[in-house]
């Protein structure tokens, strides 16, 4: 209660100051357009190397704007720190220089926005500073800033009120800047390689392209239920059928599933499809994307994630899923076996399975149980069973497996790709098998998308497809241990 009263007292004091800005200073407390000549970091880049005497002689005039985050002094002289999107800069305000303008900064609270015109200088201590010659009040903050800018300790507040997190935590602010730059780097890589960026529907009549539970909504005008997309895959492939040989989309995906440190119900992916490529070509593409993204945060492409060094600059390893299982368990799934034999192996090794599973499902479960966590450095794992790859092309040498790969780093999957299934007859059979799984209790199995099958019947060239989880990639590159730290507004339970 005492803390709440103190907050209320501070808010009351700020509202009283708001009134005096109007009554005494005759200013609009919420300002108007303001034109600046430089940002804080630009000033540091230009003048940090200059001496006190050089700046004193040059008298460089600048105009800046930002939020006041620190204030020292209250009489005839005030030092204050102002932050903009690029960083912080100190301002030195003297009553004798500013005259009637001086009350603007004297009455300003932490969090207020001011515009400052001034001359570049350095203090005796060597700190780069703007000597204010004119002040403009731009906006009044009616609530006190969190924790005096020392951060927000309550993680719930950080996620629910991200604006406070961005104000208080410079590391968090920087992380989201890096996220934007990472996405830009991926876009630039795709554009350089002749991929066309496209947009596909978020509202769909069939939920396909992934094994996931969709969000369902209702379209009033059409009086039909629709699904929030769980993948962009099937529409992007339609575009390849239509002659767009290289396409990609960066966009939001929605899955009505659980939340944990690596999963949020809405998340961002990048999917791409390229005609006349196969999954080995897509490995090269994926490696290029990850190297481009890593260059945003590391010049040598080496990063540290949760204390472990990851080298994204080296050639990524390529290993078959069955070989990896054999390395870890001694079990050879290259041998053909019945479902009963696979179930016995699972029972003997304490691997759980569902009653509707085939041999391929059990092989995949062995991989998840015994191999995933061992894959620390970037590794392409290829050759997934047909049963868990309904949209991937069968391997010609062993049709039990597919020309599919996943990229693993630090025991987690970061990309999923395959040589796309372009045989409409085989695709229908796969969809029907998925529908049967749904009947047997797998509520994440896909249904039959008749329109997509029709599109394939018009002919789709051999195609390599890729999906990358952007949020998980940003987690890796910014050393974040939860997806909520890299999604600006994560899904939260209502308070």
Swiss-Prot record:
UniProt keyword Nucleotide-binding, yes or no: yes
One Pfam family hit: tRNA-synt_2
Residues that hold Mg(2+) 2 according to the record: 413
GO BP of this protein: lysyl-tRNA aminoacylation
Localization in the cell: Cytoplasm
Record has Kinase as a keyword: no
Top class in the EC scheme: ligase
GO molecular function: ATP binding; catalytic activity, acting on a protein; lysine-tRNA ligase activity; magnesium ion binding; transferase activity; tRNA binding
Cofactor note: Binds 3 Mg(2+) ions per subunit.
UniProt keywords, alphabetically: Aminoacyl-tRNA synthetase, ATP-binding, Cytoplasm, Ligase, Magnesium, Metal-binding, Nucleotide-binding, Protein biosynthesis
Record-linked Gene3D superfamilies: Bira Bifunctional Protein, Domain 2 (3.30.930.10), Nucleic acid-binding proteins (2.40.50.140)
Main location: cytoplasm
Its EC number(s): 6.1.1.6
Residue sites binding Mg(2+) 1 per the record: 406, 413
InterPro entries tied to this protein: Aa-tRNA-synt_II, aa-tRNA-synth_II, aa-tRNA-synth_II/BPL/LPL, Lys-tRNA-ligase_II, Lys-tRNA-ligase_II_N, Lys-tRNA-synth_II_C, NA-bd_OB-fold, NA-bd_OB_tRNA
Record-annotated disulphide pairs: none
Cofactor(s) needed for function: Mg(2+)
Family annotation (HAMAP family): Lys_tRNA_synth_class2
Assembly behavior: Homodimer.
UniProt xrefs under NCBIfam families: lysS_bact (TIGR00499), PRK00484.1 (NF001756)
Full protein name: Lysine--tRNA ligase
Source organism of this protein record: Leuconostoc mesenteroides subsp. mesenteroides (strain ATCC 8293 / DSM 20343 / BCRC 11652 / CCM 1803 / JCM 6124 / NCDO 523 / NBRC 100496 / NCIMB 8023 / NCTC 12954 / NRRL B-1118 / 37Y)
